[in-house]
Amino acid sequence: IRPRDWSSDVCSSDLELQWEVVGEGLSRQVMGYDGQIMLVKVKFEKGAIGYVHEHYHSQATYVVSGKFEVMINGEKKILEGGDGFYIEPDAPHGAVCLESGMLIDVFSPVRADFLKK
């Protein structure tokens, strides 16, 4: 069994990766990426807002924990731990955190704007 404090080119440990504050009550951790796909962990405090935005990337999201009001293309749904959703390219979307929680986002292609310069 390997300790949790290790990383490699193909594996990462959340103990070694930095959290980036991206808004009030909102932070993200880029877990890994290549030229085609990116895995991102997003932590929300209750009341935090992922403001409505759009991008040309495909996005699939898994709700690890918490409760969220998610809006995609004008349609709102309440989602909780264990739920997931897909956002097609250029679809307006956003979320309001109703109970503190975490999302796992997968983007294709890579969100270059998330990478440190």
Residues of each region from the PLM?
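A cytosolic small-molecule/anion-sensing beta-strand core signal
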Residues: 64-65, 80, 99
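Single conserved hydrophobic/aromatic residue that forms the stacking wall/gate
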Residues: 1-10
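A short glycine-rich, His/Asp/Glu-containing loop-to-beta-strand
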Residues: 17-48, 106
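Short acidic-glycine-tyrosine-enriched beta hairpin
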Residues: 74-89
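Ligand-binding loop in jelly-roll beta-barrel domains
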Residues: 89-113
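Short, conserved beta-strand element in jelly-roll/cupin
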Residues: 43-44, 54-70
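Structural motif
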Residues: 60, 67-69, 76, 92, ...
